[in-house]
């Protein structure tokens, strides 16, 4: 599944892996773009898989004419050994009938690379919130039992809120509750897989709606940065660098000739 660029890629055993869900507003994917662009993380490989919709495009993080000619594919891995950080960017949809196969391959690769922890950036439909979720922070987190003990104090200090379970049958049986992440793609299934495989994994997500989700990506990343300290703030603010490809997120502007 993983094909290294050049020689076989070894990740430091204490590396943190960040990856996105393909979820509402593409918030996780946009946040991953910001991380790669800001830290200028080099590409170390890609995933060769038939579980994702095929795609190819120009280098989204180009900084000069030379690297502008590079191509990108649907799943690429970036690594920054100095910060013990690895990043997987997903750029196309998981084929529905192959979701389980993709998750299994992903879990297998994570175990083989022996990542110390996995941070999964996701989003969830805001209109599905219950009355309690309408108030306070729009961010939620989930951690697997394997990670719970080591991060419980930190997340409590940050005053993060855990994703609530909701009633399976509201107003009929409130005793039976389940995890519900509408619009979260394979977030719930991947979280359950990591629990079963005893992986140290956390989900950080934001309630949002479809539209211009760039502000959601910035805010989600600021939330994650409070915990991971990926970028140190300058004068109280973290300066994230948008990739140049974002100039085309909504196409070109209106031609002046039409006015």
Swiss-Prot record:
Record keywords: Chaperone, Nucleus
Spell out the InterPro entries in the cross-references.
Answer: Proteasome_assmbl_chaperone_2, Proteasome_assmbl_chp_2_euk, PSMG2_sf
KW Cell membrane (keyword) present: no
Reading the lineage from the top rank, the first entry is: Eukaryota
> From its record, what is one biological process in GO terms?
chaperone-mediated protein complex assembly
Q: How is this chain modified after translation?
A: Degraded by the proteasome upon completion of 20S proteasome maturation.
Q: What is its main location?
A: nucleus
Cell membrane as UniProt keyword: no
Task: State a GO cellular component annotated for this protein.
Answer: cytosol
Pfam family, any one: PAC2
Q: Where in the cell is it found?
A: Nucleus
Q: What does this protein do?
A: Chaperone protein which promotes assembly of the 20S proteasome as part of a heterodimer with psmg1.
Q: To which protein family does this belong?
A: Belongs to the PSMG2 family.
Q: How does it assemble?
A: Forms a heterodimer with psmg1.
Q: What is this protein called?
A: Proteasome assembly chaperone 2
Gene name linked to the record: psmg2
């Amino acid at each position: 599944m993983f094909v290294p660029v050049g020689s076989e890629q070894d990740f430091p055993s204490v590396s943190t892996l960040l990856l996105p869900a393909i979820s509402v507003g593409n918030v996780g994917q946009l946040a991953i773009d910001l991380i790669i662009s800001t830290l200028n993380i080099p590409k170390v490989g890609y995933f060769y898989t038939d579980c994702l919709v095929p795609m190819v495009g120009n280098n989204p993080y180009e900084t000069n004419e030379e690297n502008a000619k590079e191509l990108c594919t649907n799943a690429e891995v970036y690594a920054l050994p100095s910060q013990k950080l690895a990043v997987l960017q997903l750029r196309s949809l998981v084929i529905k009938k192959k979701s389980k196969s993709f998750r299994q391959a992903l879990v297998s690769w994570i175990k083989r690379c022996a990542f110390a922890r996995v941070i999964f950036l996701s989003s969830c439909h805001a209109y599905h919130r219950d009355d309690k979720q309408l108030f306070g922070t729009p961010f939620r987190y989930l951690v697997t039992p394997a990670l719970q003990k080591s991060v419980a104090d930190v997340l409590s200090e940050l005053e993060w809120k855990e994703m609530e379970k909701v009633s399976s049958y509201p107003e009929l049986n409130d005793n039976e509750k389940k995890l519900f992440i509408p619009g979260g793609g394979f977030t719930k299934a991947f979280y359950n897989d990591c629990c079963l495989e005893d992986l140290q994994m956390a989900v950080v997500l934001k309630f949002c709606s479809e539209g211009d989700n760039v502000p959601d990506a910035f805010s989600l990343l600021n939330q994650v940065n409070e915990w991971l300290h990926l970028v140190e703030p300058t004068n109280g603010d973290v300066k994230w660098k948008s990739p140049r490809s974002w100039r085309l997120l909504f196409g070109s502007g209106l031609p002046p000739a039409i006015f």
